[in-house]
A protein has these predicted regions:
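Beta-strand-rich interaction surfaces with strong enrichment in secreted/lumenal proteins
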Residues: 72-74, 117-122
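Short, well-ordered helical secondary-structure segments
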Residues: 3, 40, 52, 119-121
């Protein structure tokens, strides 16, 4: 296979069109630009689109995700789009709980196994990082589950 170099914006002709939030290093790791939510709030689509939300709150915090319509538009989502969201509460002093909004649906795993993959609460301290996966069933609706 020939080596190819690209510069500037690149759009695929085979179906994937979207913005990359973060930097992809040569090792395949992704570095996100974190956004902070330190009080109970509804996250904006732009905040979620960064892929990495931090909380350093001393009080319990609830973060409600944006609607499927707003988030789908921000991500350029279509049916089959999969997006990972990390919540980092390692510097927080209390829990962070995630909630979904209109057109956000908890997966069966999230609804049935709340003690593991369905756990929508992120502890504070050293173990306080959660990874959540959003799988879009259309441009305006997503299924949400904890995956780590």
């Amino acid at each position: 296979m020939a080596s190819t170099t690209f510069s500037g914006p690149v759009t695929s002709t085979n179906g994937f069109i979207g913005a990359l939030t973060g930097n992809i290093a040569g090792t395949g790791s992704i570095t996100h630009t974190a956004t902070a939510i330190n009080a109970t709030a509804t996250a904006t689509a732009a905040q979620v689109a960064t892929g990495y939300i931090t909380s350093t709150s001393a009080a319990a915090t609830a973060i409600t995700l944006p609607t499927g319509t707003l988030l789908g538009a921000a991500l350029g989502a279509t049916q089959g789009t999969v997006f990972d969201l990390y919540i980092d509460n390692t510097a927080g002093a209390s829990t962070v709980t995630i909630a979904v909004a209109v057109n956000g649906i908890l997966s069966t795993a999230a609804a049935d196994t709340a003690g593991s993959f369905g756990d929508l609460t992120i502890a504070s301290g050293a173990t306080g990082i959660g990874r959540f996966t959003l799988m879009f069933s259309s441009a305006t609706a997503y299924v949400f589950t904890r995956t780590a």
